Amino acid sequence: MIVSGTKWEEDLKRAGKSKYKALARAIRDGISSGQMPAGQRLPAVRDLAHKTGMTPGTVARAYALLTDEGRLTAKVGRGTFVAKTNVMPRTEVEPLINHPNDENADFRSSRVPDVGQGVLIDQAFVRLGQSHRRRHINYPTQETDFEARAATAAWLDQDRLGGVTADDVVLGNGAQNCCLLALQSVLRGNHPVILTEELSYPGVRHAARLLRAQLVGLPIDDEGIIPEAFEQAYRAHGGQVLLTAAEVHSPTTIQTSLARKQALASIARKFNISIIEDDCHTTAPTDIPSYRAMLPEQAYFVSSLTKTVSGALRFGYVVAPTRQAKVLRQVAQSSFYGVAQPILDVCADLLTSGAAAETRNKVVAETRRRVRLAVNKLGAWDVRWREDAPFVFLQMPIGWRASSFAMACAKKNILIKPADEFALPNGAAPNAVRLGVNTCVNESLFLGAMDDMNALLGNPVVTMES
């Protein structure tokens, strides 16, 4: 199928802006017709891009689409192959969690750094076991999770949230789960629509797919979502909810300004659009109020202990709009009855004993240190960064495509995320990559990888020819 002089090449020439779809369709047809049998290896992304006159990013996007459909399978270090016919289509584009190992410098995920919190968590479990205060036999209830909800309310910045009590808080299994709960409580109708940033954390796509909702991407600038685009998108597509990472946007690190938040809240109020503010990447204090404070009857605030204390606990929370906590709690109970009681009790202990605050302060300091190290190494390039964001956003210099740079890094056992992986279905992405700064426990590995990336960025021609 992928040979010169065939009909699919003419289809690509007529494809316009949808070349990746045309390429995916051509490969799909080749598989269906038997021209591409199971196990056949596809050309390398750069080779096929050269043959077709497309960019490597376009080819990579077509491959990713077909991998998502289960028609192709990617094997690290070996290439992309036609999948076996008995392989069921995958429901996920990519895993949300990447497991690091000692051989790779893995910058794909935004993790909490190890600052000794494991010992504090162990001590909390010991205190729980020695207290014998619960038998840990029955299901968790609204009464038995009250201490954890009260501790969470006390943990939150009351000025930023507009005042929060335990009755406003609904607990879940991490921020991703809590976003799903909020979406389930808001979405309705036969064609639910979620409005969100045009670049979003991949979990947004997973949530929309799970809830069978349409995603509509909104353009952003240096101050956040553009208000006019928000209103235009609502008029064109409808939608019940805006899901936004306003304080620390992933992957760009953009912080939505106060004036911009006020403008967006005004539009949401005008059209009765709910807002879910995903605050999971925020670790340091901020002076900008949340949407929950600006629009208390329509806004949800979602976060967790994952980026400030530990991802192992899977402890997340939603601050519901006023008079909506009962509805949200019913959604949670219908989904999983409640967060496991031992986790509720241990997290309440961590929050009330000061262990969580101690850990958060160390995490903030370590994140700032790692960001400075990364910026010092890559400062010659176009890097967007903030000391309180656990990742940096690196624009590619002339001569590099993000997908090609990612492949070149992979050859050096450096794993990164191109901006394409944050694009919505059918959306565009800038020529950039995101680098999580807290992903390498070994600092020499971290610094060596930064040096390698710096060298690659400065020498794209030699790298592409090799």
Which residues make up each language-model segment?
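Conserved core of the PLP fold type I
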Residues: 135-271, 282-298, 458-465
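Conserved core segment of the aminotransferase class I/II
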Residues: 301-364, 462
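Conserved glycine-rich beta-strand-loop-beta hairpin in the small C-terminal domain of fold type I
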Residues: 364-375, 383-396, 408
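N-terminal basic, amphipathic alpha-helical segments
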Residues: 1-129, 134-138, 333-340, 362-366, ...
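Short hydrophobic/aromatic beta-strand micro-patches
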Residues: 319, 393-395, 436-438
